[in-house]
C-alpha cells in the first residue's frame, strides 16, 4: 500500500502463501522486509489448501451462465451454493459479482488471471528449487470429475474456454479414470484431466520452507496479532493485541479473509477498503488405507 520511494522497508501482515510470497518477492528486489503473523508461517488457511497451481484457475466463479442458473441453485440448495441470512449484508457485492459474470468482463478477467498464473508458476518452481522442495512437487496435473452425463454437459462452456487458452487437457471416461487412478470410486463417468497443472503434497510445509529461505536472506518474522491500522504522514502504524504501536514506512495486508475486517475496524479512508467474499476454509484429513492412494488432486 502506498509504497514510498524514499524507503525500502516494508511490513507484510500475514504469513500464509500470499504473504510469504510477497515477502520473498520484495526481498529479492532489495527491500528490507518484516513478516507479521499471530501464529507463524503456514498455520492458517495455507495449512489446508489444495496446493494446486493450474492454468485452469483462469476460470473465475462468476462466469457466463451463472445468472441463468442462479434460481435453480437458490431454490434447490446443494453443495455448490448455500445462502445464509447473514450473507444478505453483502448484497451489493453479490450484484457486482453477477454483473462481472457477463462475457465482456469474463474475457478481461480470464486473460488477466492466465497471465498471473503463468508468471507465478515459474516463480514457484524457482523458489522450490532454492528451498530444496522438488520432492514435494507433482507435475502430473489434476482431475476434474463428473458423476453423470448431465454434469459433464454442464461443463461445456468451461471446457471450451480452456481450449481457447490452449490449456492442455484430456477427456477421460469411466474406464480411463480407473486406469489412471485405480483407487478412485467407480461412480465417476467422465473427467477432464488438466495436464497443465502442478501440485504439492504439503502446502503448509512449502510455506514454512519459503519462510526459512526468507529468514536465511535477512528477513524478519514477528509473531503478533494485528488489531488496527492507522495511516501516518510518512507511513503506517499498526497496533498489536497488547495495544502496542508499531511503525512501518510501507505495508502489505495479506491476511486473507481477515483483511476486510481489519481494514473496516481501522476506519481507514475509502480507498483502502477491501470488498471481499471468500470460500469457507474447511478441510479434513482422512486416515489412509494401506496401499490406497491418489497420484494427483481430484
Regions found by a protein language model. Name each.
Residues 172-180, 222-236:
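A conserved short coil-to-beta-strand element within the FAD-binding core of flavoproteins
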Residues 48-115:
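Glycine-rich active-site loop/strand segments that organize a redox cofactor
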Residues 8-35:
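N-terminal Rossmann-like FAD-binding beta1-loop-alpha1 element of flavoenzymes
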Residues 92-213:
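Rossmann-like flavin
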Residues 39-44, 240-294:
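Central helical "cap/lid" subdomain
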Residues 31, 167, 219:
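Short phosphate-binding/catalytic loops that engage adenosine nucleotides
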Residues 28-48:
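Glycine-rich FAD pyrophosphate-binding loop
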Residues 2-3, 15, 21, 172, ...:
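Flavin (primarily FAD) cofactor-binding/catalytic cores of flavoenzymes
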Amino acid at each position: 500500500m502506498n509504497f514510498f520511494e524514499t524507503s525500502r522497508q516494508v511490513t507484510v501482515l500475514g504469513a500464509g502463501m500470499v504473504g510469504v510470497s510477497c515477502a520473498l518477492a520484495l526481498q529479492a528486489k532489495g527491500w528490507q522486509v518484516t513478516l507479521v503473523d499471530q501464529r507463524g508461517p503456514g498455520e492458517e488457511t495455507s495449512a489446508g489448501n489444495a496446493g494446486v497451481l493450474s492454468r485452469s484457475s483462469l476460470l473465475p466463479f462468476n462466469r457466463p451462465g451463472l445468472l441463468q442458473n442462479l434460481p435453480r441453485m437458490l431454490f434447490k440448495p446443494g453443495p455448490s451454493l448455500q445462502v445464509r441470512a447473514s450473507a444478505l449484508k453483502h448484497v451489493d457485492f453479490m450484484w457486482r459479482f453477477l454483473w462481472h459474470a457477463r462475457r465482456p468482463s469474463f474475457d478481461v478477467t480470464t486473460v488477466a488471471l492466465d497471465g498471473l498464473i503463468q508468471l507465478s508458476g515459474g516463480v514457484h518452481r524457482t523458489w522450490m528449487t532454492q528451498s530444496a522442495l522438488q520432492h514435494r512437487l507433482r507435475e502430473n496435473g489434476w482431475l476434474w470429475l463428473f458423476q453423470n452425463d448431465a454434469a459433464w454437459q454442464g461443463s461445456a462452456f468451461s471446457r471450451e474456454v480452456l481450449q481457447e487458452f490452449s490449456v492442455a487437457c484430456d477427456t477421460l471416461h469411466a474406464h480411463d479414470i480407473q486406469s489412471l487412478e485405480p483407487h478412485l470410486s467407480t461412480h465417476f463417468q467422465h473427467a477432464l484431466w488438466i495436464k497443465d497443472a502442478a501440485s504439492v503434497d504439503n502446502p503448509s510445509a512449502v510455506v514454512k520452507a519459503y519462510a526459512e529461505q526468507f529468514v536465511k536472506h535477512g528477513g524478519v518474522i514477528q509473531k503478533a496479532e494485528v488489531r488496527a491500522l492507522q495511516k501516518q504522514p510518512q507511513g503506517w502504524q499498526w497496533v498489536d493485541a497488547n495495544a502496542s504501536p508499531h511503525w512501518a514506512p510501507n505495508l502489505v495486508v495479506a491476511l486473507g479473509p481477515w483483511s476486510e475486517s481489519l481494514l473496516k475496524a481501522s476506519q481507514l479512508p475509502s480507498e483502502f477498503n477491501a470488498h471481499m467474499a471468500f470460500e469457507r476454509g474447511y478441510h479434513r484429513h482422512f486416515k489412509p488405507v494401506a496401499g490406497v492412494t491418489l497420484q494427483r488432486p481430484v
